[in-house]
Curated annotation (Swiss-Prot):
UniProt KW Coiled coil keyword: no
Gene3D superfamilies, alphabetized: baseplate structural protein gp8, domain 1
Protein name per the record: Virion protein 3
Presence of the UniProt keyword tRNA processing in the record: no
Functional summary from the UniProt entry: Putative baseplate protein.
Annotated GO CC locations: virus tail, baseplate
InterPro entries with a match to the protein in the record: Gp8_sf
Alphabetical UniProt keywords: Viral baseplate protein, Viral tail protein, Virion
Localization of this protein: Virion
Species name: Enterococcus phage phiEF24C
Amino acid sequence: MAIATNNSRVYASLQLKNKQDSMYLAIGKTTPWTNEDAPPAPDPTTTTLTEVIGYKKVARVSLCREYLPSDDSKYPVVSYGSRKFTLIPDEDGYKEQAWMVYVEAEITGDELPTGTFRQVGIHTDLVSKASSEKKALLPTDVTDAGILQFFENRQQQNRTSDVILKEKFIITMENKKSVKQ
């Protein structure tokens, strides 16, 4: 079996990162899971979230890699769970072997309908109706949801108008590996 080279992983990460203009966080699944304490494993054949509540334009996308102590003076560093990652500029992607992508989005108050949700995902190539410049979109504002690139099933989360939801993702281009928080 052939393997992907490190440079091909950086290339794939750059391709994804360059979709930022059409990249949106999606939240959905308002109805309960069969077992609320144990959401089902995500199905890789899924093409859209269940019961989409809305979409929010991502705020930040960057190449990244595992943190090294020497990074503090060279590049920005972000925390993801209990781990640190270094944000790498595109021009240094190959040199730094940055084959991960950091994605950050924020939903503030009631810019999308409030209430419970159980799924989050990242869409690329989303097309809004009438070239809308809005950053928060309802499903009715969307002509084409594009490609659901990544998603996660979760236990119930509740958003109220007083809550700021900040979602961060580290997407790795390595096969059969995911980054745990």
